[in-house]
């Protein structure tokens, strides 16, 4: 539902420097791999179904809420879209995302991870979705699906929303972990800092 300014459909591509995308235009790796030697600056969605290596920072300007989720025209409601989709198929671990920089990842929509995420940075998520028919019947900011892995080097802040860590999945962060409503863990969960429930939207 978004225009795409940078896409890898198959094969591999490498960019030695930084990348800046126009507002409202996504980054899309359908298969294959994309390596970026610097920062990525954007105000839209990251779709990664292959291998994406960002050696610098992933800077998503979440103040530009008109563009920040995958659902065009419905962006005033954070529940209508996600800001990061890593992989596509539950249980297959079909994508890999590496972020080398230490600037916090900031996502206005929610986050879906079917694959592996390795980030030296922390992560803040403001959006949420509902998971009807699942173990979580509440607002969920981050879904780490079955067999998925997610590592964050710093603090993870999910605002006042829930976290779902699926069967055999792995989650860890190098700082504090803040969530709301509930954390459901069916896999492995570790936080190096404090674990705190945030009741403030």
Roles of regions detected by a PLM:
Residues 1-201:
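Extracellular beta-strand-rich, repetitive "passenger/adhesive" scaffolds
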């Amino acid at each position: 539902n978004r225009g795409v300014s940078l896409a890898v459909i198959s094969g591999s591509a490498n960019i030695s420097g930084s990348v800046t995308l126009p507002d409202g235009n996504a980054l899309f790796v359908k298969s294959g791999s994309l390596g970026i030697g610097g920062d990525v600056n954007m105000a839209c969605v990251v779709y990664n179904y292959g291998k994406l290596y960002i050696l610098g920072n992933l800077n998503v300007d979440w103040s530009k809420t008109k563009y920040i989720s995958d659902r065009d025209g419905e962006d005033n409601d954070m529940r209508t879209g996600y800001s990061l989709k890593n992989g596509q198929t539950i249980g297959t671990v079909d994508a890999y995302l590496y972020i080398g920089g230490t600037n916090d990842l900031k996502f206005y929509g929610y986050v879906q991870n079917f694959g592996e995420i390795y980030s030296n940075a922390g992560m803040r998520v403001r959006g949420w979705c509902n998971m009807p028919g699942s173990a979580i019947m509440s607002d969920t900011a981050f879904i780490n699906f079955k067999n998925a892995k997610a590592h964050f080097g710093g603090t993870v802040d999910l605002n006042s929303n829930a976290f779902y860590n699926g069967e055999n999945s792995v989650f860890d962060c190098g700082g504090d972990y803040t969530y709301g409503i509930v954390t459901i863990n069916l896999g492995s969960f570790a936080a190096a800092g404090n674990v705190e429930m945030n009741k403030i939207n």
